[in-house]
């Protein structure tokens, strides 16, 4: 038994006798009733691909006043999903068939089409068959029977008109017959290989390979910025940038190594080393340290390996 869904506007809910009359008139169907406002508010949901017919009820008072009930886009999509393939969406009084119906475009955009009766039908795309398209292949040449008044060329026989006495007398000659050309025949042309591949390297010679690549100005990197490599770089730019970054990092690491002083760098640090002088060049040249600000000022020159102690109560002159 086919299933039928009735969508009633809220105005019909106040007239239960009208709803009973409508339901009894369609007793041959398995009927269900839903209120349009509850469906629009999302309080109820319709099962998918269930109903063969969805009937949109209209209150007669609304038609008299000219207030046509509207359906939102969400309600229309719910109705289309609830219809089975090939199911119909009908309305009382032929409302959907009227070109002045405001939701006519929305119904068509939802995937419904009009039939000859003005009802909306959900297309059954599953019933459509897929027809493969095949390319024509070379056919074997068959000997064509030719009459004495015909000419044969490339396996196609064309009957030629024969001049008669009536034509010589100025009267039109009756055409004996015309040959039909089979356009699906390849006329013994060599078959085409659809799988033939073209070698890209064969399209360029040595002169083309030696030409420099001209980079458009819009593709050049801006001043102070270097060009970035693509994510799937295949031109070698990513490897070159990686090598440059590795070299820069190695140079930076070498510059940040721990400072190491050799024996020739201890002139300012240890004055007990024999033959070493301070930056002023006066240390150990005389009999005492004389530089202003030197912590050893006034002391005699130190001997190599001598331990020097400065007491806080010593007066430095």
From Swiss-Prot:
It is found in: Cytoplasm; Mitochondrion intermembrane space. The C-terminal domain binds 2 Fe-S clusters but is otherwise mostly in an intrinsically disordered conformation. Coiled coil: none annotated. GO terms for cellular component: mitochondrial intermembrane space. Pfam families: CIAPIN1, DRE2_N. It comes from Uncinocarpus reesii (strain UAMH 1704). Keywords: 2Fe-2S, 4Fe-4S, Cytoplasm, Iron, Iron-sulfur, Metal-binding, Mitochondrion. Its main location: cytoplasm. Belongs to the anamorsin family. Residues 280-294 are annotated as: Fe-S binding site B. This is Fe-S cluster assembly protein DRE2. The keyword Lyase does not apply. Residues 132-209 are annotated as: Linker. Its cofactor is [2Fe-2S] cluster; [4Fe-4S] cluster. Component of the cytosolic iron-sulfur (Fe-S) protein assembly (CIA) machinery required for the maturation of extramitochondrial Fe-S proteins. Part of an electron transfer chain functioning in an early step of cytosolic Fe-S biogenesis, facilitating the de novo assembly of a [4Fe-4S] cluster on the scaffold complex CFD1-NBP35. Electrons are transferred to DRE2 from NADPH via the FAD- and FMN-containing protein TAH18. Residues 219-235 are annotated as: Fe-S binding site A. [4Fe-4S] cluster binds at residues 280, 283, 291, 294. A motif (Cx2C motif 2) lies at residues 291-294. It comes from the Eukaryota. One of its GO terms (biological process) is iron-sulfur cluster assembly. InterPro entries: Anamorsin, CIAPIN1, Dre2_N. One of its GO terms (molecular function) is 4 iron, 4 sulfur cluster binding. Monomer. Interacts with TAH18. Interacts with MIA40. [2Fe-2S] cluster binds at residues 219, 230, 233, 235. Gene3D superfamilies: Fe-S cluster assembly protein Dre2, N-terminal domain. Residues 1-131 are annotated as: N-terminal SAM-like domain.
